[in-house]
């Protein structure tokens, strides 16, 4: 019999929020009797935007903004129906994007 696996990818701009969410997911899965591997930190994606400060001239005066996207990966091996129900009822912050693959 093949092992079932749930793979959860989390994305957020704030690393504290994503770590709290990952901890909640791991704790919930372990409490329901499933094996958990993770959270595994994935590489942080960094986007840099450069804009000209002035409206009409002064091209040498520029400002840079950056946006960092933190990512985590959690694998839940051999999930029970109780695990799936517990994960569906979990309340996570709005700043976290969740992708679930079965």
UniProtKB/Swiss-Prot annotation:
The keyword Cell inner membrane appears for this protein: no
Write out the entry's keywords from A to Z.
Ribonucleoprotein, Ribosomal protein
UniProt-listed GO biological process terms: translation
The record's InterPro entries line, in alphabetical order, gives: Ribosomal_uS10 (IPR001848), Ribosomal_uS10_CS (IPR018268), Ribosomal_uS10_dom (IPR027486), Ribosomal_uS10_dom_sf (IPR036838)
Is Ribonucleoprotein one of the keywords?
yes
In terms of superkingdom, the source organism counts as Bacteria
Question: GO CC annotations?
Answer: ribonucleoprotein complex; ribosome
One GO term in the molecular function aspect is: structural constituent of ribosome
* Oligomer status and interactors: Part of the 30S ribosomal subunit.
Which family is this protein grouped under? Belongs to the universal ribosomal protein uS10 family.
Supply the NCBIfam families for this chain. PRK00596.1, rpsJ_bact
The job of this chain, per UniProt, is described as: Involved in the binding of tRNA to the ribosomes.
Q: Report what the protein is called.
A: Small ribosomal subunit protein uS10
Q: Which organism is it from?
A: Staphylococcus haemolyticus (strain JCSC1435)
């Amino acid at each position: 019999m093949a092992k079932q696996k749930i793979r959860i990818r989390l994305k957020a701009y704030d690393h504290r929020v994503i770590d709290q969410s990952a901890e909640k997911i791991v704790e919930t899965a372990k409490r329901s009797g499933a094996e958990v591997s993770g959270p595994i930190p994935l590489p942080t994606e960094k986007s840099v935007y450069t804009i000209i400060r002035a409206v009409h001239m002064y091209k040498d005066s520029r400002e840079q903004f950056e946006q960092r996207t933190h990512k985590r990966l959690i694998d839940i091996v051999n999930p029970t129906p109780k695990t799936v129900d517990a994960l569906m009822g979990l309340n996570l912050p709005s700043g976290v994007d969740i992708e679930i693959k079965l």
